Structure formats: C-alpha cells, structure tokens
Amino acid sequence: NIKRGSILGYIGENGAGKSTTIKLILGDMKKDCGEIYIFGKKIEELSEDEKKKIAFVFEDFFFPQDMNIGQVEKFHSIYYGKYWEKEIFDKLIKKFSLPNKKKISSFSRGMKMKLSLILALSHNPELLILDEATSGLDPVARDDILDILLDFIQDENKSIMISSHILSDLEKIADEIAFLHRGKLIFVENKDKLKEDYGIVSLSKEEFESLDKNSIIAVRDHKFGKECLVKKELIPQNLEVENASIEEIMVYMIKEKYDESLNI
C-alpha cells in the first residue's frame, strides 16, 4: 500500500522478488495468486488512460541509439497524447543541461538515466516506479536523480516506489521501507520508526548472556563477544546502543538471524 505523497523504498537481496513485483505491475508476468490493486482497481481492470498515469524507469535503457532528444520527445508526445507535458520536458532538459542535438549513443550513463526519468515525469504520472534507477551512477548523478524525485513528490497526489540496492539513497528520500526476502514481505515500516526502534550493540559474552533475549533480532560473533541487532526499548540504559542503518537492519535480519520465530 503506497500512500499518496510518499516514497516507498523497496529492498531485498538479489532474487528476493523485487523485479518480479515490478514486472507483475507492468504486465510482463502473470501472477500465481493474489491481486494487485492500483488506483483502487485490480491491475487487469485499469483502462489505457489509467495505465498512462503510471511511469516506469529501469536500470537499462531502451532508446534507439541513433536518435537525439528531440526525436525521442516527439515519439513520446505522440504515444502519450493529451497527457504529454512538453513544458515539463523542456524545463527539465534545460535544468540538467542535456544536449538536444547529440545522439543518445554519445550520452553517459548518468545522462541517459536523467533522460529516462525526464521522459517518465513528462506525462504527468500519479505513480512513478523505479527499478535500480541509480545503479552504476556516480554520487553527483545519483544526487541529481534524487533531487528530481523529491521535487516530483511535492505534489501530494503523487507516489513513488523505488527498488534499489543503494540503500543510502533510500535513507535520504524514502518515507517507508518495504523489505522483501525470498518472495515474502517481511515488513513495511516507516523509515524513521525503523531507525528509532532498532540499534546495534556490542556486548561481552557475559553481557549477552544477561540480556533479555526478546530484545535480540540478530547476532554476529566478534573477537570480544557479540554484536547484536536489538530492539532499543528493551535494552538497559547502561548499554550503549548505536543507530542502525537500513542496510544493517536488512543484512542482519537475513544473515545473522537470532530469533527463529521471526520466520525470515
């Protein structure tokens, strides 16, 4: 359930099912069971106009390499018709200094990704879905992409779902995090609440043995004892608990699980 006016970060290891979810939304795969609802309707019941309110941006590029920006824009304007916003397109092309006359084949990866995102935004979608859109980009290009997304989401009727292995990007922009593991949704949680609820604590063997085991999510052995992902509220105040990043929470839950009842 992606809330309007929010960004959902979709995380999980390779093979967890993130891209499969996106392919199901796109209609490239048939589901085995369950239903997918978008705009309050089953995805199979969406009209062509409603489908054009969804935009996708992928890690790979599908532009004819011998085209320039003007030719790509013309193709998209014909396809999207009344939904196409040339003013938005021209504004973003100018903002990011993309060359109108050069062939797409001469573009860097960062330039191609910016063009992909600009094209997606220029038919005024209500739902924007990105699959590894910042993968392989340098930090400056990634930051530019994140700025575009944050501008887009200022409209509270818009929503973004972004699947990424670069979890530091999601730390910056996501409102909620959905964690998928082996095809199972482990949690959907507010990002700030995740960081408030979980932490990492280093313990001697004696401290570990005396700790309330209900507080422990995952454990990693180290030279001096144990390092644990814990529920902060159950940890004694005399122990120093470090903040856990989203990446640490995911890795600990997958690799170092302590509580078998978590069913991860």
Predicted regions and their residues:
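Generic alpha-helical secondary structure signal
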Residues: 48, 83-91, 192, 206, ...
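ABC transporter nucleotide-binding domain
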Residues: 145-230
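ABC transporter nucleotide-binding domains
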Residues: 1-162, 167-168, 172-175, 181
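C-terminal coupling/interaction segments
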Residues: 217-264
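Alpha-helix N-cap/helix-start and coil->helix boundary motif
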Residues: 70, 167, 208, 246-247
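Short, surface-exposed beta-strand/loop "edge" segments at domain boundaries and coil↔beta transitions
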Residues: 128-129, 207-211, 234-238
